[in-house]
Design a protein with these regions (language model features):
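Substrate-binding cleft of extracellular glycoside hydrolase catalytic domains
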Residues: 1-77, 81-83
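Alpha-helical scaffolding within the catalytic cores
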Residues: 24, 90-104, 126-138, 161-170
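Loop/turn elements at helix/coil->beta-strand transitions in domains of secreted/extracellular proteins
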Residues: 31-40, 79-86, 107-111, 141-147, ...
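Aromatic-lined carbohydrate-recognition surfaces of secreted/lumenal glycan-active proteins
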Residues: 42-44, 68-97, 144-156, 181-184
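Extracytoplasmic/secreted cell-surface and envelope-processing proteins
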Residues: 50-53, 95-99, 120-124, 155-160, ...
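Chitinase-like catalytic core of GlcNAc-active glycosidases
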Residues: 51-54, 65, 93, 108, ...
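Aromatic- and acid-rich polysaccharide-binding/catalytic face
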Residues: 99-125, 182
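Substrate-binding cleft of secreted/luminal carbohydrate-active enzymes
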Residues: 144-223
Length: 223
């Protein structure tokens, strides 16, 4: 699919039409004062796995890079969208080379990320910490912020200390700009805490730590 939508592909014009809709939406995001709202834009995520049509095994590194670069340049230069921060977020990787295999270039990425979930086969407090330590030097080399762009434990009904004993350990000593846990659909599919859940009090303890800043703790970030 990627080869068909990048420049020269038979579906390239159709892809441009999709991007026109993306651009219209992004440009509609304004404050009451008329200022554009900044957006963390994370296209083609988890590409180191094969679960998506843009993932490894479904396209080459060259095709992926061409897709990323065209997308950014079209939105920025053709459509005038300047309120996006582009986030590069592979899935679990085995090495720094693996992480950078599909790297579109320093000029095409604003934030480096990682998507990794806590599972029975992949413990976040041990495997996650090792992976974070493995990757933490790349943001310094690229002079860009690093974030935990997707994580969580799905439907946590038993681990009351998950935030302080699992997630906190995974990011210990790692200068992550932000952590994003996935959505809460309902009580049968959730990743974040909610009133009455088993980890509610532990989450409050977690966010009270010195490493964590919530929206209420931050002022003037757009100045």
């Amino acid at each position: 699919a990627v080869g068909r939508i990048i420049p020269g592909g038979d579906l390239h014009e159709k892809y441009c039409g999709w991007l026109d809709k993306v651009a219209a939406f992004m440009l509609s995001l304004r404050t009451d004062a008329g200022e554009y709202v900044p957006v963390l834009f994370r296209p083609f995520h988890e590409h180191t796995g094969n679960g998506f049509w843009w993932g490894k095994g479904n396209c080459t590194a060259e095709e992926y890079i061409a897709l990323w670069r065209f997308t950014l340049e079209y939105l920025r230069d053709t459509k005038g969208v300047h309120n996006l921060l582009y986030v590069y977020s592979p899935d679990i990787v085995s090495s720094q080379d693996n992480y950078l295999e599909f790297w579109p270039g320093d000029a095409y990425v604003d934030v480096l990320g990682l998507d990794a979930y806590d599972r029975s086969s992949w413990a976040i407090e041990t495997n996650g910490l090792r992976l974070m330590r493995l990757l933490k030097h790349i943001p310094y080399l690229k002079n860009k912020p690093f974030a935990f762009t997707e994580t969580g434990l799905e439907n946590n009904t038993s681990q009351s200390k998950w935030w302080t004993e699992k997630l906190s350990k995974a990011i210990a000593g790692i200068p992550v700009a932000y952590v994003l846990v996935w959505r809460n659909k309902d009580t049968n599919h959730f990743f974040g805490p909610y009133p009455g859940c088993v980890s509610e009090e532990d989450f409050k303890t977690f966010v009270a730590g010195e490493q964590i800043l919530l929206e209420k703790d931050i002022a003037g970030i757009y100045e």
